Amino acid sequence: MDKNGIIIRVIITLLFLVSLYFVEAGFCGSSVIAKYNDGFGTVDMKNYDVKMVQNALSPMNEKEIKVYKLYYLVDFIFVLCFGAFQLMLVNDVFSFERSKLITYIIFGVPIFRGICDIIENAILLWTLHTYPVINEMAISISAKFTSAKLMSIKVWILLVAIGLIWRVILYLKR
C-alpha cells in the first residue's frame, strides 16, 4: 500500500472515531439525550414503536428537543463517516475477490445501511420538528428502516469476519 493510501485510511478511521464520539458522548450525543429522557437515550439504535417514541420524548422540554434535533444533524455526518469506514474495510478485506456479483453484494451492504440510516434520521428529525404531534405511520416506517439498518450492520460484521478468515485460509494455502 502506498503512502497516500495509508493517509486516506488513517483520515477515514479518524473521521469515523471522532464522529462516533460526537454521536455517543458529544455535546448533543446519545448520553446527553439520555439525561433528558430518564435514561432512554435515542431511539435510532433500538427496536421501537410509536409508544416508545412518545415515552422517550414526553419528559423532554423544548430546549432538550432542540438538542435532540442537533443529535440527528450530527448523526448524518456520522452516517457518512461510518459508511466510508465500512466501505474502506470491505475493500481492504475483500481485495482478493474477483467476482463482480460478490463485490456488489459486499459493497451493497454498507451502502444499504447508509441509505436506511439516512431515511430513518430524516423521519425522526421530522418527528422532532412536529412534536408533540407524532405521525404513527412515519414512526412505523422509520422503525422498519432502523431494523433494516441494524440487520445490515450485523451482516457487515459477519462479512468482514468471513473475509478475514478467507484471507487467512488463502494465505496459509500459499
Explain the meaning of each model-derived region.
Residues 20-27, 70, 143-146, 150, ...:
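Multi-pass alpha-helical transmembrane bundle typical of ion/small-solute transporters
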Residues 1-3, 93-101, 172-174:
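Membrane-interface helix-boundary motifs at transmembrane edges
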Residues 70-90, 157, 161:
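Hydrophobic alpha-helical transmembrane segments
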